[in-house]
Curated annotation (Swiss-Prot):
Function: Truncated and inactivated form of SRK, the female specificity determinant of self-incompatibility when active. Most A.thaliana cultivars contain such an inactive form and thus, are self-fertiles.
Protein's name according to its UniProt entry: Putative inactive G-type lectin S-receptor-like serine/threonine-protein kinase SRK
Keyword terms, alphabetized: ATP-binding, Cell membrane, Disulfide bond, Glycoprotein, Lectin, Membrane, Nucleotide-binding, Receptor, Signal, Transmembrane, Transmembrane helix
PANTHER family for this protein: BULB-TYPE LECTIN DOMAIN-CONTAINING PROTEIN, INACTIVE G-TYPE LECTIN S-RECEPTOR-LIKE SERINE_THREONINE-PROTEIN KINASE SRK-RELATED
Ranges where the EGF-like domain occurs: 293-329
Major place of residence: membrane
PAN domain ranges (all copies): 348-428
Annotated family: Belongs to the protein kinase superfamily. Ser/Thr protein kinase family.
Residues listed as glycosylation sites in the UniProt record: 46, 120, 147, 243, 387
Organism placement in taxonomy: Eukaryota, Viridiplantae, Streptophyta, Embryophyta, Tracheophyta
Length: 546
């Protein structure tokens, strides 16, 4: 018995100490990270849920007026920064409200026990669930047993408000039918849904759009394997590792920070600008390291179809080669919001492609995507499709792969100084006039030389034929080996060295038939040779008539 007295004494001492400790430090008594089915949070109790590492805190809050909200904010940051609001569009109108678990759902009740917000889970109801705030800022509902499945029954990360935290996914979950996007606050003092959204569009290639009233304000460009084609600076974020996933189950973007002790977030502000922040502990303030849209060229379709935006030119809008302003007067006066039209209509079979380098490629919502083929096959595919107006690679890694072809009008492209993507635009062959002139000169020269050779050959053949005919016509008339023309004068036959037939000479001497001469000279017998002269051999002959 004596040995038990000190133990009882220490137990009493511990409980007395714990009682006074909780009385003196009431905040510590409510710093829990879970909410069980038997517990609740009320506005009046000032109770909150704090993540295990003390990074985030969840509780009721108000900014101005009598509207109360349930939200999550950074616990250790001096500037109160909200990252999630549960009942943003259904605030409590007075300081009487409660958060609890009911039928395996998280619910917020007002002073009349009316549900103003709920997780709305349906299906089989678990006997015991618990809500927990994690150190990454995710508020989850899960089974109360630790050995149960790691899959959450519900999580706040699936229902973002205006902020994307590290490890939080933005995009579509096909398996559960979720589309996760951020929506701005209505004002700096009103967390209800504002007019601007930043969400994923999966038609064509997946890419993010900034919307207002369902009108596009800006666009990230599609994922090109390394970054979004309209956010080249992503590769300069050394402290942030980002990932884009596209498969049958989900299409989503997420990021994480390399320094787990630092705080980073992406937030869409009240005027629709998406901003990236990191917390600077020494200055005790948020540092904005990135934002979008950052200039005029980031505004969606600012230059209209068939035109590109370039911040280094004046005006910033430029019609693509082969196109011209629909209203040159408006463009000359500085109004470049009009359209560009083709100078020469396409002919399908003879069209060619003009290469635009370092571009943010057009919106792909109406494009055809084939990731199985390369750039050469993509060009052939575009050529055979007469309505194809441009093509490009879908992935720029390892020299490029995949194919995007645009049908009809395309818009929202811009030119970068470097690191952009190649875009091949279809133009009529006539738009390549300068190149065709050089080519035409070469072809013309080849044809000219060929014609000259053929003509020279024809002339040569004609000349050879004429020479042959001339020789045949001018050949001396003789008998066997003695082919020559004979001239007979007073019974004397002389062989002329040369006399063309057909030449008319004014001869007074009588002409004698050749047969007669042969007979008269006894077949040119040597016995009848009189001698040789300048005109050849001279024969004597005797005619029949004496």
């Amino acid at each position: 018995m004596r040995g038990e007295l000190p133990n009882k004494h220490h137990s009493y001492t511990f409980f007395v100490f714990l009682f006074f400790f909780l009385i003196l430090f009431p905040d510590l008594s409510i710093s829990v990270n879970t909410l069980s089915a038997t517990e609740s949070l009320t506005i009046s109790s000032n109770k909150t849920i704090v993540s295990p590492g003390g990074v985030f805190e969840l509780g009721f809050f108000r900014i101005l007026g009598d509207s109360w909200y349930l939200g999550i904010w950074y616990k250790k940051i001096s500037q109160r920064t909200y990252v999630w609001v549960a009942n943003r569009d259904t605030p409590l109108s007075n300081p009487i409200g409660i958060l609890k678990i009911s039928n395996a759902n998280l619910v917020i009740l007002d002073n009349s026990d009316t549900h103003v917000w709920s997780t709305n889970l349906t299906g089989a109801v678990r006997s015991s669930v618990v809500a927990e705030l994690l150190d990454n800022g995710n508020f989850v509902l899960r089974g109360s047993k630790i050995n149960e499945s790691d899959e959450f029954l519900w999580q706040s990360f699936d229902f973002p408000t205006d902020t994307l935290l590290p490890q939080m996914k933005l995009g579509r979950d096909h398996k559960r039918g979720l589309n996760r996007f951020v929506t701005s606050w209505k004002s700096s003092f009103d967390p209800s849904s504002g007019s601007f959204m930043f969400k994923l569009e999966t038609l064509g290639l997946p890419e993010f759009f900034g919307f207002t009233s369902f009108l596009e304000v800006y666009r990230s460009g599609p994922w090109d394997g390394l970054r979004f084609s309209g956010i080249l600076e992503m590769q300069q974020w050394d402290d942030i590792i980002y990932n884009f996933t596209e498969n049958r189950e989900e299409v989503a973007y997420t990021f994480r920070v390399t320094d787990h002790n630092s705080y980073s977030r992406l937030t869409i502000n009240t005027v629709g600008r998406l901003e990236g922040f990191t917390w600077e502990p020494t200055q005790q303030e948020w540092n904005m390291f990135w934002f979008m849209p950052k200039d005029t060229c980031d505004l969606y379709g600012i230059c209209g179809p068939y035109a590109y935006c370039d911040m280094s030119t004046s005006p910033t809008c430029n019609c693509i080669k082969g196109f011209q302003p629909l209203s040159p007067q408006d463009w000359a006066s500085g109004d470049v919001t009009g359209r560009c039209r083709r100078k020469t209509q396409l002919t399908c079979g003879e069209d060619r492609f003009f290469r635009l380098m370092n571009m943010k490629i057009p919106a792909t919502t109406a494009a055809i995507v084939d990731k199985r083929i390369g750039l050469k096959e993509c060009e052939e595919k575009c050529k055979t499709h007469c309505n194809c107006t441009a093509y490009a690679n879908s992935d720029i890694r390892n020299g490029g792969s995949g194919c995007i072809i645009w049908i009809g009008e395309f818009r929202d492209i811009r030119n970068y100084a470097a690191d952009g993507q190649d875009l091949f635009v279809r133009l009529a062959a006539a738009e390549f006039g300068e190149r065709r002139t050089i080519r035409g000169k070469i072809i013309g020269l080849i044809i000219g030389i060929s014609l000259m050779l053929v003509l020279s050959f024809i002339i040569y053949c004609f000349w050879k034929k004429k020479q042959k005919r001339a020789r045949a016509t001018a050949a001396p008339i003789g008998y066997r080996d003695r082919i020559q023309e004979l001239i007979i004068t007073n019974g004397v036959v002389m062989s002329s060295g040369r006399r063309l037939l057909g030449e008319e000479e004014d001869l007074e001497l009588p002409l004698t038939e050749f047969e007669t001469v042969v007979m008269a000279t006894e077949n040119f017998s040597d016995s009848n040779i009189l001698g040789r002269g300048g005109f050849g051999i001279v024969y004597k002959g005797r005619l029949l008539d004496g």
